[in-house]
């Protein structure tokens, strides 16, 4: 692991607080976000570079990979989304192999994948990261206030919460003083490449290099289409149930992420990558499908990405709560949703034969 993190943690509480406050002022974000980002980066270092975390390969994905891995979104991303390589927990399974199975055999196989991932996350990984955290805190003279525990709200029992020791003042309730390591073994693995991530405070410490290398990160083109599938599912869920899935909590970020990606070359290239689109939808149908998502309709001609009018009020509330995580100028949600609607029109202007 990068010894620079220990150098920072060995400083006094006052010095660490000043570091986080100063970086927050420079970036236009809360000091609590900067502190949490520091621990997000430490956690990524522990997951991908710690000598004690031997085991199956991991893949970094989701919104945090867009911000930390590629700098494509200007949103503080507070949690870590990782996928365990299935074959390395004894569960090799491609979409093609699963499609060839009967319904009962397929269900049993998917359950086996889930159970194997649960065992690894709540056993080996929990033990390894707990040991690394304890060793880091002991070596830097910080009281053992941090801890790692299973997330009691995860019904799949595949997520962990890392409660880190804090030196900043309490912030708003939207930013929890814990990093959620959201895990699973069902996500697509390709394309990916090794990446380097850095905490925000790296720019404030020229005498240190806080780079975290070797972070195997999914390509942003897949993340873009994964987000598109999520938006389609959110809208279809509303159409079927007349409610915003999850009560609209922490979902506006998906609309923002798509908006930001569309403003980047990587996003525009992803829009044209219809092979990736089909692969993402096919994968989601196999591993994450719910009837109310209507993923069979997530094809050119029938994508539904723009929210129903009845969804917008809840999305506005969630977006306002989330806006403190955005650096610099905050895009108006009307502009965000308009861009999503334009994307829907663009995708549906192409027939299946032309896609």
Q: What name fits each language-model region?
A:
Residues 67:
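Betabetaalpha-Me/HNH-type nuclease active-site subdomain
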Residues 60-64:
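Glycine-rich beta-strand-to-loop/alpha-helix junction loops that act as flexible
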Residues 1-58, 70-74, 84-355:
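Structured mid-to-C-terminal alpha-helical surface segments
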């Amino acid at each position: 692991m990068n010894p620079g993190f220990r150098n920072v943690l060995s400083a006094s509480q006052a010095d660490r607080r000043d570091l986080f406050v100063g970086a927050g002022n420079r970036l236009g974000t809360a000091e609590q976000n900067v502190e949490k980002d520091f621990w997000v980066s430490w956690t990524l270092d522990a997951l991908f570079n710690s000598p004690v975390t031997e085991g199956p390969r991991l893949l970094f994905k989701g919104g945090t990979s867009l911000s930390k891995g590629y700098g494509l979104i200007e949103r503080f991303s507070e949690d870590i989304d990782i996928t365990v390589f299935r074959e390395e927990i004894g569960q090799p399974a491609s979409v093609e192999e699963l499609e060839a199975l009967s319904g009962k055999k397929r269900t049993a196989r998917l359950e086996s994948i889930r159970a194997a991932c649960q065992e690894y996350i709540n056993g080996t990984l929990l033990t390894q990261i707990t040991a690394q955290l304890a060793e880091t805190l002991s070596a830097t003279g910080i009281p053992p206030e941090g801890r790692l525990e299973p997330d009691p709200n995860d019904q799949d029992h595949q997520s962990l919460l890392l409660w880190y020791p804090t030196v900043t003042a309490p912030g708003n309730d939207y930013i929890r003083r814990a990093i959620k390591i959201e895990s699973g073994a069902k996500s697509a693995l390709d394309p990916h490449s090794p990446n380097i991530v850095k905490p925000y405070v790296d720019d404030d410490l020229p005498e240190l290099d806080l780079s975290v290398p070797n972070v195997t990160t999914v390509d942003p083109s897949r993340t873009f289409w994964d987000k598109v599938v999520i938006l389609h599912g959110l809208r279809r869920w509303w159409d079927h149930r007349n409610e915003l899935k999850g009560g609209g909590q922490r979902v506006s970020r998906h609309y923002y992420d798509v908006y930001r990606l569309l403003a980047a070359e990587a996003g525009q290239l992803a829009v044209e990558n219809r092979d990736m689109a089909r692969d993402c939808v096919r994968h989601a149908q196999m591993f994450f499908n719910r009837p109310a998502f209507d993923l069979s309709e997530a094809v050119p001609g029938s994508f539904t990405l723009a929210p129903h009018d009845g969804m917008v009020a809840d999305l506005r509330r969630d977006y306002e709560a989330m806006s403190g995580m955005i650096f610099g100028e905050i895009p108006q949600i009307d502009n965000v949703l308009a861009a999503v609607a334009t994307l829907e029109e663009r995708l549906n202007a192409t027939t299946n034969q032309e896609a």
